[in-house]
């Protein structure tokens, strides 16, 4: 995960973060989708993040990159319906991984192993968006309804 303060201080760091977490994902998806479109079937599963749902103070550059990918997937999903290609946006919450080793862990953290079964289940059920763990759907619903006048004052 990119360092937010470094991204704010140096546009090149923000640019790198957006390329790594956003544009590289879209470029890879483009290559895969071309093959799936030719096959006229398939499923593309992409891991984004709940961070892409609202610009939060601690990580808005990372969140912007993930929002870009989720928006891309939403449009792609509609454009590939006729080709029998299913697009899945997996939105994990706080996951204990090499990317998050520097962060303090708490109650809402999960391991990759603990969320994998729900992701596999969601793919099998042809879900469009999978929150992992599923309680993040409710958390993000609440985060997204906080009025901007309040949200801009809190660091969550």
Show which residues each predicted segment covers.
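Active-site helix of classical SDR
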Residues: 29, 65
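C-terminal helical subdomain
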Residues: 89, 104-141
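Short, flexible catalytic-loop segment of classical short-chain dehydrogenase/reductase
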Residues: 92-102
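Residue(s) in the substrate-gating loop at a strand-loop-helix junction
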Residues: 49
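Conserved mid-core segment of classical short-chain dehydrogenase/reductases
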Residues: 1-15, 58
